[in-house]
Structure formats: structure tokens, C-alpha cells
Amino acid sequence: MAQAEFSLQEKDKKRLIKDRLVRLAVTSGGVGVLAALILIFVYLAMVIIPLFSDAEIKPNHVTRTTQVGMPLAISVDDYSQLAFVLTQSGEIQYLSMDAPDKPAIYTQQLATNPVSFSQSAPGLGWYGLVDDQGLAHIFKPEFNATLRENTRPPEVVALSTDMNLTLTNAQDPVTQFVFSASTQTPTIVWQTRSGKVKARWQEKSALGVAPTTIDFSFSAGFDAPQQMLLTPDGETLYLRDGSELIVLTKAAQKFTVREVIDLTQGDKKHSVRTIDLLAGAYSLLVTHNDGRVSQWFDTLQNDKRTLTHIRDFKLASELKYLLPDSHRKGFYSFYTNGTLQSHYTTSEKLVLFKRAYKQAPAMAAMSNNEHYLITWNDDSLKVAEVDNSYPEVSLSSLWQKVWYEGYPEPEFVWQSTSASDNFEAKFSLVPIAFGTIKAAMFAMLFSVPLAVLGAIYTAYFMSPRMRRVVKPSIELMEALPTVIIGFLAGLWFAPIVEDHLITVVVMLFVLPLSTMVMGGLWALIPQSLRNRLPNGWHALVLMPVILLLIGIGVWISPSIEQTFFGGDMRLFLTNHGIGFDQRNSLVVGLAMGFAVIPTIFTIAEDAIFSVPKHLSDGSLALGATPWQTLIYVVLLTASPGIFSAIMMGLGRAVGETMIVLMATGNTPLMDWNILEGLRSLSATIAVELPESEVGSSHYRLLFLAALILFVFTFAVNALAELVRQRLRDKYRAL
């Protein structure tokens, strides 16, 4: 007996050890899953956080002295190794920044006795001098890299044109001029000491004939402007007279006044100090004497282009001058006390604020890659290293409407790439987040009724024999790859919807309504006839009726289209301002709903079928009808599982990639129109991440999109579990 008790104790110890090992394994698995989720979140956050960091500057990265006096222009190469200085005498000197004591490595006299200087819009690198004889010299200093010799031999490229560059004579010298250095149609506008403003340009001729040179003299009303700016294409000229701006455009071989604008907008305390072109020359930066900087660009109003005030930057009155970025839509502001600020116009973000100098430099310029800022003051050149990688990103630019260049009003826009170096990045996450919600909503609108109602019928009403066929068949649908579903939806189903739109619309309304009507008619059939059909086989009788209704719908659709839509439903919708795309939200909703139905159906059906039999039997025994038992007993008991099924389907729909990618036009639209396309977060990540530059704003924003998807899915699942637990506790007593 004692030996038997000892044996039982041994078994209890083994069982206890096994229980502890299994408990440890299960706990470790759960903790491992949570740890993996936390690591994913931390990694995504580490990639995203730099987007919202401030810019940094190292003011004295490289320094060297010069003996040329106040220069006309300065610049530095993309490696801060070579700089040039354009002197007042018209000589350009290339200086090595690596060897501060070394004399100029290359010099060239570009003009003799220059009397006027000008430079092109930011980022283009063209400069111009007019000598005392009225001859214009337009050139572009370059830093050419020769890797084989490990040197960067400088080169000054002159404008190649056969246009006469002699603008005036010595008796009436040029006081200011502007130019566009297009090799096809260069344009020069100048003002002489007498105050006259003239222009000269070349226009292309047809059939290969040499370009025609055109001289144009402005009328007396344009005499002596204080400042002139010309866009790089030579088509738009700005003349500033005090705080008044005259906008002229080139047409019919002359400049004509498009509009005259009061830059103070009626407030005299905002008098204008100077104007500058932003990179790309689409925007105008107006510096006011009170330190305010305003941005203006052309918008389309009443079918006419007009220069419109867009936004203001309230800077201090100690502002000395602005320096626009070379390619991006930002600018640097220099103050008399040496403070340096940098703003980005699109995001309205202050990206840099630092007391970088003892006093404001007399002159400043940016390298072409915008990594180095060169300044001149007191015969000293200083190069500062600038780390300003993500100026275009701010919370407001991501989630609020932004007024982009050329747009008539503020909008939500996602456009990450362009062929232009001066492209204004449009990084609003709202359109792609909206597209994600839109796709998920239409998918759930299609899948939830079919899946939940199908699960109810299969689990509660269907005969066991039919259930053994139907349930595995629907579960088998989940094994279909979504890429195949998306492929069929985009290349096969979308053209069918386009060609038979009216038929699809009719079916969406006719099938649900006719099914309910058939249910009502079935109740009118005598009980003796209904009893001949075994319980659970009603769906089999409904199938021929559905096929018949589909045939009738296809047959009457052309008549409906002819009667109500003038014979072409797509044209009718277009004429009434409703857009139509072949790959649209309707196709996505049907295709993605097809993919989501098995998930919702399986979980909901299992929840309903698992309701204890004694609950429904007790309800029926107390006199309740099967329908009352279903509503008040079965569905209440199974409601936690049904809710979880719907939330799981929602999570699947939100994260779906291939169906949305292949079945839509992938266009980031902000429209609830079911007949237009969309772009989702997941599809954007799949398409753009392989082509994005690692570490760029675009790259990190795609990780932010991934984090949004991750957090949303986690929140949906957490909410589903919370609601499921509460519903289970509420109906536990049933």
C-alpha cells in the first residue's frame, strides 16, 4: 500500500513538472509575441523620429581669407573643397578650401570694367556682367570632378547664342539687368542710366529657320523700377516700384502688363524692402521692412492667372536679407546680430534657429547639393556644414491642407516624385489614409452582410449534410492568394464592370431585395407544401430563383439604361460631374470582400455553432419560435465571436495590399465616389519603398505609413478583444 502511494506521488510530481514546463512554454511564447510587437514598434519609431528633428549647422567647417574686397558673387562645390569669388573688377578666382594659404588655383577675366551684375534664379548657377561699353557677358562657373586625377578642374561656361549681347553704349550705361539663360531662347531685360527699360530675346522659328531676335522698349510708365526679376523661361517679368509690383508676360513679340499688385495689401506699415524668387521660380518671396516675409505665386482664378498672396512668415525687424535654397522650397534669413534662421515654405516649419555668426555676413550662397553654406565677411570666406534633411515634413503638412504652388486652393495631396529638381514635395498622408479607410469600408459593406448572415444560416438552419459541404468550401476560399484575386479583379472583372455597369448596379439592388421578397412569398405557401422540403435545404431551392433573377436583370438592364440614363450610364454620370474609372472602389470592394468573407464567416459560424444546445432547446421548449430563439438567445450568446469576426475582417481589409494595388488606379483621390479609384497606405508602401532613397524624407514617411497601419491594426484587435471579453461576461449567465 505504501509503495502504491509513493508511485502516485511520483506521478503527481511528473505531472506537476510537465504542467510547469508547458506553462513556461506558453508564457514564453506569449511574451515573445509581445516582445516582437514592441521591437517592431521601436524599430519603426527609430526610423521615423529623425523626420521631426531640427536642422543642424557647423558654422566654421572651413575658413580662408581673401584679398579681393567685397565680391559680386561667391559659391562652393558639393564637397566644400573648392570655392570661387567673382570680384568687382570682373575676375573670377577659384580658391582651394583645403589649402587656405594657397593662392587662387585658377583665375579668368570675364569682363572689363563691369558696371552691372545679375544672377539667375536659385539653383541654376548662371551669372551676368555688363561692361562699360554695354556688352553683356553671361556665364556659368562649374566645378567639374575628374575622379581619375582626383582633382576638380574649374571651368567657366559662356552662354552659347548668336543673339547680339551689346545692350547699349557708353553714353547711357546699364544700371541693372536680368536675364534668362535658355540656350534656345535667351532673354535679357535691362535698365539704363536714363531710366529706360528695354528687352531683347530670341524666338524659335518654324521649319528649322534661325531664331528671330526681338528688341522691345517699354513705355514711359515703366521707367526706373527699383528691382527687376525674370523667370528662367523668360516668360514672366516682375518690376518693383516701391511696394507696387508690375507683372508682365511675354506674348506676340512684346511684354504686356498682366496685373499690378499692391504688395502691402493696403497696410502701409508692411512696405516692401526687396523681392526674391524661390527655387523653381514659381514663387515670389517679398521681404517687408517690418521683418515680415510673404510668399506669392500664380493661381487660377476665374480662368485667369493672378499672383496671389499665400502665406506669411513673421520674422524680426532686424532681418538683413534672405537666401533661397538652391532646389528646395525653403530659405535662410540672416539677422544683423548674426542669428541664422531657416524656414520651409510648404510646411511653414522653422527648421533652424541659431546664433551662427558674430554679425550678419555681407554675402552668402548655398552649394548645389544644399549641404554647405558659404559666407563672406571682412575678406574672409567661411563654409558652414548644414544638415537639413527633412524640412518638408511637419505635422501640419502631413495632416492639414497645404497650399501648393500652382494649386487654386489648399488641398490634401500625396505626390512623392517628379522629374524636376525643383519639385515641391507633397507629403500629405490624408489621401492614402483616406483611401485605406475607403477600400476597407466598401469591402466590409459587401462582405459583412454576406458572411455574417451566411454564418447564421449555415450554423443554425442548414442541414448537417449540406453544412459539411458548404463550410469547407467557403473556408477553402481563404486559401486563394490575394495576388490572384487582385489580378483577376484588375484585368478580368474591372473591364466587365466597365462594359456592363448598369447590369452590376441593378444586380446590387435586385438580388438582396428579391431574396427578401422570396422569403416573404415562401411564408405564404401552404404549410403542407413547405413541409415536403426537409429542414435546412431551403437554400437549394433559392439557387434557381437567384439564377433566374440574374438572367432577368441582365435582360432588362439595357432597357433601364436607355430609359433613365440616355443609353450610356457612364456618359450620364460624367455629364453630371460623377467621375468613373475602370479600376474603381466598386471593383475593390467586391474583390476584397470576396477575400474577407472566409475570415468573417469561419469565426462567426464557429461562434454560433458553438452555442450550447441546451440553451436553444430550452428556449424552444418554453414556446419561443426558432427565429426568436436565434435573435434573443443564440446571437446574444455568440455576439462576442461575431464581433471578433467582423473586427478580424476589418483588420484584414485595412492591411490588404495586392488587391488594392492591382484592382485600383492607385491614384490618391479624396472622394467617396464608389466609381473612382483610390490609393491605400499598404499599396503605397509596396509600390514606392523599393524606389525610395534610403534615409530620405520619402523613405521615412513610408515607414510612418507602416507605423500607422501597425498601430491601427493593433488598436482594432485590442478593441475587438476588449469588447469580446465584456460581451462574454455580460451574456455568461445565459
Q: What is the predicted function of each stretch?
A:
Residues 13-20, 51-90, 94-123, 128-130, ...:
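Periplasmic/extracellular loop-to-transmembrane helix junction in inner-membrane transport proteins
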Residues 89-95, 133-140, 148, 192-203, ...:
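Structural motif
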Residues 426-440, 494-514, 532-599:
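Loop-to-helix entry region at the N-terminal start of transmembrane alpha-helices
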Residues 443-474, 518-527, 720-729:
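Transmembrane-helix boundary motif in ABC transporter permease subunits
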Residues 517-528, 605, 609, 613, ...:
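C-terminal transmembrane helix and the adjacent membrane-cytosol boundary/short C-terminal tail
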Residues 600-603, 611, 626-661:
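Transmembrane alpha-helices
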Residues 660-710:
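Interhelical loop and adjacent transmembrane-helix boundary motif
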